[in-house]
Amino acid sequence: MNMCTDGKKYHSTATSAAVGASAPGVPDARAIAAICEQLRQHVADLGVLYIKLHNYHWHIYGIEFKQVHELLEEYYVSVTEAFDTIAERLLQLGAQAPASMAEYLALSGIAEETEKEITIVSALARVKRDFEYLSTRFSQTQVLAAESGDAVTDGIITDILRTLGKAIWMLGATLKA
């Protein structure tokens, strides 16, 4: 267990002699703390997005309702998987994941959706914008994890970025119509 500059304890594979040093492939305590801060925001972002996607899933209207209703379900299932994986990664690193709507809203860069009647085009454009935001944020975390030698977090984030990239591309193609 490593002690970070913020006084929190974080687990890593580093030996106590390597704490604060940059052992090859082993993130130091400061890097782990920085990664955990970003992962906490990702959990919050995904928590807010999960609820937002449900709002769209329930309240969209338009000619292609059934297809978009099912697409939004695919998205929130995917978000759930990422949400859980990142929260569990935080726990593996010895940190705590935010676990309340109040925490999510305080940490998230994604705004709540309170509108109840949403056109399909509007909902998909908003989802695309949120996915683009997530892609930018996850890319920053992926770089930090890779540079720090945190291969596990790097791999998790790379998988999420692959999924987001495809969704952004497909939403862009859909919205061109």
UniProtKB/Swiss-Prot annotation:
Presence of the UniProt keyword Disulfide bond in the record: yes
Molecular function via GO: ferric iron binding; oxidoreductase activity, acting on metal ions
Organism domain of life: Bacteria
Keywords assigned by UniProt, alphabetized: Disulfide bond
Matches recorded under InterPro entries: DPS_DNA-bd, DPS_DNA-bd_CS, Ferritin-like, Ferritin-like_SF, Ferritin_DPS_dom
Assembly notes: Homodecamer; either linked or stabilized by disulfide bonds.
Annotated family: Belongs to the Dps family.
The name this protein goes by in its record: Antigen TpF1
Native source species: Treponema pallidum (strain Nichols)
Taxonomic path: Bacteria, Pseudomonadati, Spirochaetota, Spirochaetia, Spirochaetales
